[in-house]
Amino acid sequence: MGSAEDRRFEVLRAIVADFVATKEPIGSKTLVDRHNLGVSSATVRNDMAVLEAEGYITQPHTSSGRVPTEKGYREFVDRLDDVKPMSSAERRAILSFLESGVDLDDVLRRAVRLLAQLTRQVAVVQYPMLSTSTVRRLEVVALTPARLLLIVITDSGRIDQRIVELGDAIDEDELTQLRDLLGQALEGKPLTTASIAVSDLASHLGGQGRLANAVGRSATVLVESLVEHREERLLLGGTANLTRNTADFGGSLRSLLEALEEQVVVLRLLAKQQEAGKVTVRIGHETEAEEMAGASVVTTAYGSAGKVFGGMGVLGPTRMDYPGTIANVAAVALYIGEVLGNR
């Protein structure tokens, strides 16, 4: 790579940084005054002319300055040397805030709120995917001899509680047998096969009697719990942040808000995240969604012990602080996985 090309990239990097910070088109004199580029204003003007000819920057109609294009942002992101890590104090604060969540729902609500505050963009977190969760533990609590509370706890921290009306009361020995049978059928199995296992248990046990009745009724309730598709749920935070950047979206803000409300497009983008720790940046038309033509999406996956629970990320204008956003998304995802994995 030649020195002229390296220098032009430094000019591009400076244009991106200044435009993100100021929202104002950037001129050559401004770049020379603000950045130690080591060349004259005339050289910077020539470099900007080349960058414009190659499609990395463009000139708004009402200004003599230049702004980055989607191609320019992509070049900037692809050539990020490093992403500034968070300080140990910042990391401790994030972990402490998430650890204070009382359950899965609370942890994810805290995460989406925190990410929106850190990035000043729209944050999205997907509920743990049914297809990757396993049953960690099943608890059976007798509320009365004929009424049970079933508690399903998954490896992703999801806790689902269901009441079972038995009709016929069972004694302590039968309760213990029921607990053992259901636990053996479910614990350690993926949710996608656990529902089949508990149905098979009820079928194989068959017959009459109080235990068979209790297994059958419990199985019916558990199947309903296990087949709920919670991966189709998204938590959103910071939607009001979009209104701060209305001009950045041109006339596409309404369609973007509709896409967020319907969730389908966002879920499709998050579904592509299959590897925790890897952050993906999609800029403008790279989202392959017409509704998001003026937006950038920074996504990753969260999980624990090598298993992906779900996707999460940030959505905002292409005029985005990419290094800061990437760092924040990666950090919050890391600590969500750590918190859920330790529960």
Swiss-Prot record:
The keyword RNA-binding does not apply. Pfam families: HrcA (PF01628). GO terms for biological process: negative regulation of DNA-templated transcription. Keywords: Repressor, Stress response, Transcription, Transcription regulation. GO terms for molecular function: DNA binding. Belongs to the HrcA family. NCBIfam families: hrcA. This is Heat-inducible transcription repressor HrcA.
